[in-house]
Design a protein with these regions (language model features):
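Active-site hotspot residues in diverse enzymes, especially metal/ion-binding acidic/histidine motifs
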Residues: 1-269
Length: 269
């Protein structure tokens, strides 16, 4: 849709309708979902709506060639039948969630791009401004944010503390919360920049600490669109797709392909 003909609220509402999301979709049993669970929920809704979502943090299967989140966080490819979103999983969990929401907005707008705004969304490009605003509206609806911010203010919490509190109530980073507050003229530019700088230092420490590589097969199948894997498995079993082609499409082989499918089944139960 043309950028100038749609408002943030209109586009966010259209996306919620198609994906089957409520205004508080990220709240379950009175508590906010973790960024990881919110991502899984939003990804599942995308897949059900026909949007392919794939993740990877390395080049192919080469663990010695990580994708740099400083260079790009995500991208979207627009297609009438199978739009695709790719997420760089070296980014933080909350960063991945915001990137997914941002790319969803791009698909609705109909504009392809590579998203690499690492710490705060300050692009002046009209499409980027719109998509960042829509992503924020999907993850932190303005009406809910204003209500919770006022509650924090009434409890005499200063701006940095209020940002920290709200970052526990919404599945987004403190930077995104702070930007929401800045856009609403609730904090100053100086306060916002201080939060950005603090978050940057914290993320740099997290990156250097590293972590476990996890289960290979769980990691492998989580990179691929679940709907794609299900249909590929069905096509192979029906003889419409050869095993060699399935191996090529999934970057697997005779030994690993069945285990990837088994891992998908276990995670689906």
């Amino acid at each position: 849709c043309p950028v100038g003909r749609v408002t943030v609220a209109m586009l966010a509402q259209k996306i919620r309708q198609v994906l089957g999301l409520s205004l508080k979709w990220f709240v379950k049993n009175g508590r906010s979902l973790s960024a990881e669970d919110a991502f899984a929920t939003l990804r599942g809704c995308c897949e059900n709506a026909g949007v392919v979502v794939m993740l990877n943090g390395i080049v192919g299967d080469n663990t010695h060639r990580p994708l740099d989140a400083q260079e790009f966080r995500a991208f979207a490819l627009i297609d009438e039948y199978a739009p695709l979103i790719f997420i760089n999983r070296t980014d933080s969990r909350r960063g991945q969630l915001f990137s997914l929401a941002h790319e969803i907005a791009h698909i609705w707008v109909g504009a392809e791009e590579i998203y690499n705004d690492t710490y705060h969304y300050a692009s002046n490009a009209p499409v980027e401004v719109l998509c960042n605003a829509v992503a924020a509206e999907l993850l932190i609806p303005r009406s809910l944010f204003n209500e919770r911010w006022q509650d924090a203010v009434r409890n005499c919490i200063d701006a940095p503390d209020a940002v920290e509190v709200l970052a526990r109530e919404f599945p987004v980073s403190q930077v995104v919360i702070a930007r929401r507050a800045l856009d609403g003229m609730m904090i100053s530019e100086q306060e916002y920049q201080s939060i950005v700088d603090k978050s940057r230092r914290h993320w740099d420490v997290q990156k250097t600490s590293g972590g476990s590589g996890g289960n290979y097969y769980n990691t492998k199948q989580s990179r691929l669109d679940h709907r794609f894997l299900e249909r590929l498995a069905a096509s192979v079993s029906e003889g419409r797709t050869s095993y060699e082609e399935a191996y090529r499409l999934t970057g697997s082989n005779r030994k690993t392909f069945p285990k990837i499918l088994d891992s998908m089944g276990e995670r689906g139960r």
